[in-house]
Design a protein with these regions (language model features):
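Hydrophobic residues within beta-strands of alpha/beta enzymes
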Residues: 1, 35-37, 74, 169, ...
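Short, solvent-exposed loop/turn segments at secondary-structure boundaries
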Residues: 11-15, 46-53, 85-89, 153-154, ...
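Active-site beta-loop-alpha junctions enriched in small/polar residues
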Residues: 3-6, 39-42, 79-81, 114-118, ...
Length: 222
């Protein structure tokens, strides 16, 4: 599983000691393992200095949690650009991601970048730009087709651009009206993407995201 919240609390709000004492024994007893840690790290404004400093401390704790649970990946984002032109944020985004990378270096844990609406890496061109600029084995990519639909990007185009660098997939779908829908009924191009992954012999993780029902529950499925 890929935990976002554990026992009613965001995974990033746990200290290592608290997680080790309260949560890990339950996971161990029930045989639950993490494919990645669904952290919100990087989901702050690019100019939010206080928020970034807080998240660096949280990331350090998450690295210890990841090692404890035998988890290889910590999901991260590339900062909200707000009202700015994303092109004006490039250097700062890459610099901050490199700061985050220093925190995981040598731990055996990798940063897993997810494309997300309104963060710098919300379109495949900028995701690839980030990936190439960082150019480190401990910075890898997670592909979310639905999030690309939310950004008016064709997921097939994004997949073809990034498929050689993606190690992890989030599975949810979205209609052309930006409404979350059952996988395979939206614009996520899943028949193509899954077919291509089968041809390529993909053996990595895929995470279903049932929490996204809340975005669609009061909207028509179209």
């Amino acid at each position: 599983m890929c935990p976002r919240n554990v026992d009613g609390k965001n995974i990033a709000d746990y200290t290592f000691e608290e997680f080790k004492e309260k949560i890990f024994p339950v996971l161990k007893k029930e045989g639950v393992k993490f494919s990645s840690i669904g952290s919100p790290i990087g989901k702050v404004g690019i100019d939010d200095e206080e928020g970034f400093e807080k998240q660096k401390k949280q990331l350090a704790e998450l690295v210890k949690i990841a090692k404890l649970t035998g988890c290889e990946y910590i999901r991260v984002f590339s900062f909200f650009y707000g009202d700015k032109n994303p092109k004006d944020c490039t250097e700062k985004v890459i610099a901050r991601l490199k700061e985050m990378l220093k925190i995981v270096k040598g731990s055996g844990v990798k940063l897993l970048h997810e494309n997300e609406k309104k963060v710098y890496g919300d379109v495949p061109e900028r995701v690839l730009e980030i990936y190439n600029a960082i150019n480190d084995e401990d910075f890898v990519l997670c592909f979310d087709a639905s999030n690309y639909v939310q950004c008016d990007v064709n997921p097939k185009t994004a997949f073809d651009m990034l498929k050689d660098y993606v190690v992890y997939y989030h599975i949810k779908d979205c209609s052309k009206y930006k409404v979350e829908v059952p996988v395979g009924t939206g614009e996520g191009c899943y028949p193509y993407i899954l077919g291509e992954l089968k041809k390529r012999g993909y053996h990595g993780f895929m995470t279903l995201e049932p929490h996204t029902f809340k975005y669609a529950i009061f909207k028509p499925i179209v």
